[in-house]
Protein backbone atom coordinates (compact mmCIF):
# COMPACT_ATOMS: atom_id res chain seq x y z
CA UNK A 1 0.00 0.00 0.00
CA UNK A 2 1.10 3.52 -0.71
CA UNK A 3 1.70 6.20 1.87
CA UNK A 4 -1.02 8.61 2.88
CA UNK A 5 -1.48 11.42 0.38
CA UNK A 6 -2.68 14.87 1.42
CA UNK A 7 -4.71 16.85 -1.08
CA UNK A 8 -6.95 19.87 -0.85
CA UNK A 9 -10.44 19.42 -2.25
CA UNK A 10 -9.50 21.79 -5.10
CA UNK A 11 -6.70 19.40 -6.13
CA UNK A 12 -8.92 16.33 -6.36
CA UNK A 13 -10.17 15.02 -9.67
CA UNK A 14 -13.80 14.03 -10.16
CA UNK A 15 -12.75 10.36 -9.90
CA UNK A 16 -11.12 11.03 -6.51
CA UNK A 17 -14.24 12.73 -5.20
CA UNK A 18 -16.38 9.87 -6.47
CA UNK A 19 -14.07 7.36 -4.75
CA UNK A 20 -14.38 9.27 -1.46
CA UNK A 21 -18.16 9.26 -1.74
CA UNK A 22 -18.23 5.55 -2.63
CA UNK A 23 -15.95 4.64 0.29
CA UNK A 24 -18.03 6.66 2.77
CA UNK A 25 -21.31 5.26 1.42
CA UNK A 26 -19.95 1.72 1.84
CA UNK A 27 -18.62 2.45 5.33
CA UNK A 28 -21.68 4.24 6.70
CA UNK A 29 -24.55 3.03 4.52
CA UNK A 30 -27.71 5.11 4.55
CA UNK A 31 -26.39 7.16 7.47
CA UNK A 32 -23.97 8.99 5.14
CA UNK A 33 -26.04 11.74 3.55
CA UNK A 34 -25.43 14.32 0.85
CA UNK A 35 -24.96 16.87 3.66
CA UNK A 36 -22.33 14.65 5.31
CA UNK A 37 -20.45 14.47 2.02
CA UNK A 38 -20.70 18.25 1.61
CA UNK A 39 -19.28 18.71 5.13
CA UNK A 40 -16.13 16.83 4.08
CA UNK A 41 -15.34 19.20 1.21
CA UNK A 42 -13.37 22.44 1.19
CA UNK A 43 -10.40 21.37 3.28
CA UNK A 44 -7.60 18.83 3.13
CA UNK A 45 -8.07 15.11 2.60
CA UNK A 46 -5.85 12.30 3.85
CA UNK A 47 -6.08 9.50 1.29
CA UNK A 48 -4.66 5.98 1.50
CA UNK A 49 -4.67 3.88 -1.64
CA UNK A 50 -4.02 0.22 -2.33
CA UNK A 51 -2.97 0.41 -5.95
CA UNK A 52 -5.66 2.54 -7.59
CA UNK A 53 -8.28 1.75 -4.96
CA UNK A 54 -9.03 4.23 -2.18
CA UNK A 55 -9.08 2.23 1.07
CA UNK A 56 -8.98 4.95 3.75
CA UNK A 57 -9.95 8.61 3.98
CA UNK A 58 -10.27 11.45 6.46
CA UNK A 59 -11.00 15.12 5.79
CA UNK A 60 -10.09 18.21 7.80
CA UNK A 61 -12.21 21.32 7.31
CA UNK A 62 -12.21 24.70 9.00
CA UNK A 63 -15.02 25.57 11.38
CA UNK A 64 -15.63 27.97 14.25
CA UNK A 65 -16.42 26.51 17.64
CA UNK A 66 -17.57 28.99 20.28
CA UNK A 67 -16.24 28.37 23.78
CA UNK A 68 -15.96 30.62 26.79
CA UNK A 69 -16.78 33.73 24.78
CA UNK A 70 -14.26 33.00 22.02
CA UNK A 71 -14.69 31.79 18.43
CA UNK A 72 -12.00 29.12 18.16
CA UNK A 73 -10.41 28.39 14.78
CA UNK A 74 -11.14 24.68 14.61
CA UNK A 75 -9.87 21.90 12.39
CA UNK A 76 -12.89 19.63 12.21
CA UNK A 77 -12.40 16.03 11.11
CA UNK A 78 -15.01 14.58 8.77
CA UNK A 79 -15.70 11.42 6.77
CA UNK A 80 -13.18 9.07 8.37
CA UNK A 81 -13.74 5.80 6.54
CA UNK A 82 -11.85 2.57 5.87
CA UNK A 83 -12.84 -0.13 3.37
CA UNK A 84 -14.41 -3.11 5.15
CA UNK A 85 -11.89 -5.66 3.89
CA UNK A 86 -8.89 -3.75 5.30
CA UNK A 87 -10.24 -2.57 8.64
CA UNK A 88 -8.28 -3.10 11.87
CA UNK A 89 -4.96 -2.77 10.04
CA UNK A 90 -4.09 0.74 11.19
CA UNK A 91 -5.34 2.60 8.13
CA UNK A 92 -7.81 4.75 10.07
CA UNK A 93 -5.00 5.70 12.43
CA UNK A 94 -2.72 6.42 9.47
CA UNK A 95 -5.08 8.90 7.82
CA UNK A 96 -5.79 10.54 11.17
CA UNK A 97 -2.08 10.90 11.99
CA UNK A 98 -1.51 12.47 8.58
CA UNK A 99 -3.87 15.29 9.61
CA UNK A 100 -2.10 15.93 12.95
CA UNK A 101 0.40 18.53 11.67
CA UNK A 102 -2.37 20.48 9.96
CA UNK A 103 -4.34 20.62 13.19
CA UNK A 104 -1.27 21.49 15.28
CA UNK A 105 -0.07 24.30 13.02
CA UNK A 106 -3.29 25.60 11.54
CA UNK A 107 -5.83 25.60 14.34
CA UNK A 108 -6.29 26.25 18.04
CA UNK A 109 -8.66 23.30 18.37
CA UNK A 110 -9.20 19.97 16.68
CA UNK A 111 -12.67 18.44 16.99
CA UNK A 112 -14.73 15.57 15.63
CA UNK A 113 -17.96 13.74 16.26
CA UNK A 114 -17.96 9.96 16.42
CA UNK A 115 -20.04 6.92 17.15
CA UNK A 116 -19.34 4.52 20.00
CA UNK A 117 -17.61 2.24 17.48
CA UNK A 118 -15.15 4.95 16.43
CA UNK A 119 -14.37 6.27 19.91
CA UNK A 120 -11.54 3.80 20.72
CA UNK A 121 -9.59 4.88 17.63
CA UNK A 122 -9.63 8.55 18.56
CA UNK A 123 -8.87 7.88 22.22
CA UNK A 124 -5.88 5.73 21.21
CA UNK A 125 -4.61 8.61 19.05
CA UNK A 126 -4.63 11.01 22.00
CA UNK A 127 -7.91 12.77 21.36
CA UNK A 128 -9.95 13.61 24.47
CA UNK A 129 -13.63 12.89 24.87
CA UNK A 130 -15.32 16.23 25.58
CA UNK A 131 -16.88 15.91 29.06
CA UNK A 132 -18.97 19.07 28.90
CA UNK A 133 -22.17 20.09 27.15
CA UNK A 134 -22.54 20.81 23.45
CA UNK A 135 -24.73 23.22 21.53
CA UNK A 136 -25.16 24.75 18.08
CA UNK A 137 -25.45 28.36 16.99
CA UNK A 138 -28.65 28.02 14.94
CA UNK A 139 -30.68 30.62 13.03
CA UNK A 140 -32.88 30.69 16.16
CA UNK A 141 -29.99 31.24 18.57
CA UNK A 142 -27.90 28.87 20.65
CA UNK A 143 -29.59 25.49 21.10
CA UNK A 144 -28.31 22.53 23.15
CA UNK A 145 -27.34 19.42 21.17
CA UNK A 146 -27.78 16.67 23.78
CA UNK A 147 -27.56 13.99 21.09
CA UNK A 148 -23.93 15.00 20.51
CA UNK A 149 -22.98 14.99 24.20
CA UNK A 150 -20.58 12.15 24.90
CA UNK A 151 -19.64 11.80 21.24
CA UNK A 152 -17.35 14.79 20.62
CA UNK A 153 -13.59 14.40 20.80
CA UNK A 154 -11.23 17.36 20.98
CA UNK A 155 -7.55 18.15 20.71
CA UNK A 156 -6.81 21.50 22.35
CA UNK A 157 -3.81 23.06 20.62
CA UNK A 158 -4.09 26.64 21.81
CA UNK A 159 -4.81 26.23 25.53
CA UNK A 160 -7.13 24.46 27.89
CA UNK A 161 -10.89 24.23 27.54
CA UNK A 162 -13.33 24.65 30.42
CA UNK A 163 -15.70 21.65 30.55
CA UNK A 164 -18.12 23.83 32.50
CA UNK A 165 -18.65 25.90 29.35
CA UNK A 166 -20.36 24.36 26.31
CA UNK A 167 -18.72 23.80 22.97
CA UNK A 168 -20.98 25.57 20.48
CA UNK A 169 -20.59 24.62 16.83
CA UNK A 170 -21.43 26.80 13.87
CA UNK A 171 -24.61 26.15 11.89
CA UNK A 172 -24.74 23.95 8.82
CA UNK A 173 -27.18 21.71 6.96
CA UNK A 174 -27.59 18.13 8.17
CA UNK A 175 -25.90 17.03 11.37
CA UNK A 176 -24.50 20.16 12.97
CA UNK A 177 -21.79 18.15 14.70
Predicted regions and their residues:
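Acidic/histidine-enriched, glycine/proline-rich intrinsically disordered or flexible terminal extensions
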Residues: 143-177
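Conserved GNAT acetyl-CoA-binding A-motif
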Residues: 101-115
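Conserved active-site tyrosine of GNAT-family acetyltransferases
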Residues: 20, 122, 127
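Conserved acetyl-CoA pyrophosphate-binding loop and the N-cap/start of the following alpha-helix
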Residues: 86-98
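Conserved catalytic-core motifs of GNAT/GCN5-like acyltransferases
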Residues: 113, 128-154
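Conserved N-terminal entry element of GNAT/NAT acetyltransferase domains
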Residues: 1-14, 167-176
Amino acid sequence: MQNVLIRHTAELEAADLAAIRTLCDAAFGDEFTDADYEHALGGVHALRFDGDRLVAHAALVGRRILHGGRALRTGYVEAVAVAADVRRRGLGAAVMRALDPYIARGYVLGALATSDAGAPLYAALGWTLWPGPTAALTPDGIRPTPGADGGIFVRAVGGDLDPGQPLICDWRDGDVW
